[in-house]
Amino acid sequence: MKIKMFFLTTAFITQSTYASELPVIPLRDLVNAALTHQPSVAVSYYETEKKNSDLDLSRAALYPTLDLTSGLNNNRKESSGTERNVENKVSLSYRITDFGVRGANIRKSEYERDNSKTDYEKTKNIVSQEVVTTYYNISKYREMIDGVNLEKEFYKKMLETFSLLVSSGVAMQSDMRKVQVSIDALNTRSIMYQSMLDDEMYKMQNMTGLNLSPVQIQSDEKFNLFKKYIFVESPEKLMDMVMKYNDDYKILVNTRKAATEDINAAKSSYFPTVDLVSSYVQNNPSGSAKKSDYEDEFKTGINVSFNIFNGFRNSAQERKMVASYSQAKLQIDDFLIKTRYNIDSQLSRYAAAKETYSVAERSHTNALQLTELYEQEFQLGQKSLLDLISSRNEAFQAYVSMIDSKYSLYILKLQQLSLIFHLMDYLKGNTESELNVMK
């Protein structure tokens, strides 16, 4: 039995030493790991590569095309036998003008390329926000568990004291039961918070690809960057910042501009196209073929192509593009309406959360002071054990409310920051002053 206890003690000490030696990973490193690990970020990146290629394809229409073709022709004639000729042809074609179709397509591709870059940054921002939210939840549940453990230590000491008092006949058995009930209630809370903490840790590990321990997550006391963030409480100023920095708004504006270029291209299709065409043909006759019948030739000319009728295809295409443009404008209006509502709602929730945190903090301080008084009065016999336990419960509930409201404030700051800026830039630590200057 002694050997077994020795090994258990050794294992516990080793585990504690190992836990204390685990490196604390800063939040910025966790975000970087998630950006590297999450496939959605890579998918968004390759979308930018596709749009860059689409832009190159659109620009390729500005250049001439040069083709080389070779062919062998056999021509059997009864009078002269078989004539053979190897024809080598070099063709040069260049579109002189199409009255704006190519330019409109290039500008559209540029807007789509810009949208893909913005969407890439948006994807990174979403992943960053998920990591930071999970980090906050981990930190919150760790604080909850720490609070539970402190309460359990108090009740365990009280249980030891009452065990001695009961055995000596000074206290009653029911007093011990009251203390044990409080410990059981705290154990239930501890299990619940631990389950929530484990769930958030699994989420963090899934997002980052790292095998983490809760002790490796940077504690809230050592991470105060979001505490320093000045919450924008002016809806007009916040709306201006959204229209300047928000990724969704940028994408919608570029989509509208791309639709404008589609309309321009559709209107330009009513005009003719003018092409410069040149070709050089080199003939190499053989067999019974005569050289005079297969002379080399060089041609050059200008082709003008004008569509007279194509079943109203051009007008249908123009109407389609006009509808797409109207749709893009309405999507911007819809975004602005929803954003204004979200801003008003966010500001209202922030004001309530700030007031709630202030009240909860004050309530926790008062509850602790009340508990201290009850402890003194309990020792003097002026308060019952039930009174003391009730005061401890009130203090603990105030602690839970204070922690909840504190992290509610953090989450609201995080949501606003994600709305107007890229979290990764903010986490670099060199943009905080810039953000506050913009306000």
What does each model-found stretch correspond to?
Residues 28-38, 176, 210-279, 426-439:
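Amphipathic alpha-helical coiled-coil scaffold segments and their short linker/junction regions
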Residues 42, 65-85, 93-122, 250, ...:
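Small/polar (Gly/Ser/Thr/Ala-rich) solvent-exposed segments
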Residues 4-13:
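Sec-dependent N-terminal signal peptides
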Residues 43-58, 123, 127-148, 157, ...:
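Amphipathic alpha-helical coiled-coil segments
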Residues 85-87, 133, 178, 297-299:
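Transmembrane beta-barrel architecture of outer-membrane proteins
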